[in-house]
Amino acid sequence: MQKKDMEIEITLLTVTAVSLFTIKLTRKAYRFALSARIGMSAMLVLTAIGHFMFTKGMAMMMPAFIPFKTELVYFTGFVEIAAAIGLQLPKLRVLTGWLLILFFILILPVNIYAAIHHVDMATATFNGDGLDYLWYRVPLQLVFIAWIYFSAIKARDPEAFDIENNPPYAYRKNI
């Protein structure tokens, strides 16, 4: 298991938990889906940063027939940042959720290719974990897909950040 994956899991879970309790304190209610989307957005920003820090290693994760590998790594980094923002915008949340699920499905073959070829994206070498890594990565990818589905698509709080129509609890008394 690569260290970067533990960092993204820790970020996802920690930011989700902190958001959950912060929202509970400010809105007097738990907003699980909103907290999960905030956690996923933080994770996406972290992984996007990885696209700019580990560009060479990420380019090595793609098969030879894919052109413009470096540009594609940068592009997908920007896509992840856009998705992080889209998850927080009520009007774009569901569309962003579906596009993220598609994105997570499309990048899985890249992770499989990288595992087959022992790519270590952080060091840009062929000293990675190999096929054993897939026993971790494939279920993790399924967790990400479920996380997005339940927090962005199936969630019932589309106006969670709409301050005008859904103000925090402390301000409702004055309206």
Question: What do the PLM-derived regions correspond to, one by one?
Answer:
Residues M1-I175:
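Membrane-interface extramembranous regions
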